Amino acid sequence: MYINTILFDLDGTLIDTAPDLSYALNTLLEEAGLEAKSFEKIKPLVAFGGKALIKFGFNYDEEHPEFFKRHQELLEIYTNNIDLNSKPFEGVIALIKILKDRQINWGIVTNKPEYLTHLLLQKLNINVDVVVCGDTLEFS
């Protein structure tokens, strides 16, 4: 069987974004006068997106009157610090080169918003054949 395309998740698979997402959440918590959370507790949640981080950090559900505002603030902090410590996992750049050399298309399917995905890939100088994000399609 010949494989001509491979799709990957982004956060926690290709790119270690946990440090910058953790930084964004803890910055927001500290600005709100709350105690920062440990990286070890935040790290498993990053794959579930910013809303999961707000639920964890503030103990809010999505019906809380400040949930949307806090989520937007988190995204703003993250946007401004998206490449502070995020980096490809070991071997990812070599893997991308192998795929290109073998003329295998590759892409990303992620729950991360499109504007953040493209910004992160640009900052890390990663060129990809196709990207499908959490807000790319009508249903995610």
Give names to the regions the model predicted.
Residues 84-87, 113-140:
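Substrate-recognition "cap/lid" segment bordering the active-site pocket of phosphatases
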Residues 2-93, 102, 113-115:
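N-terminal helical cap/lid subdomain that shapes the substrate entry/recognition surface
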Residues 25, 95-122, 134:
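Substrate-recognition element of Asp-dependent hydrolases with the DxDx(T/V) motif
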Residues 5-7, 107, 130:
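Hydrophobic "anchor" residues on beta-strands that sit immediately upstream
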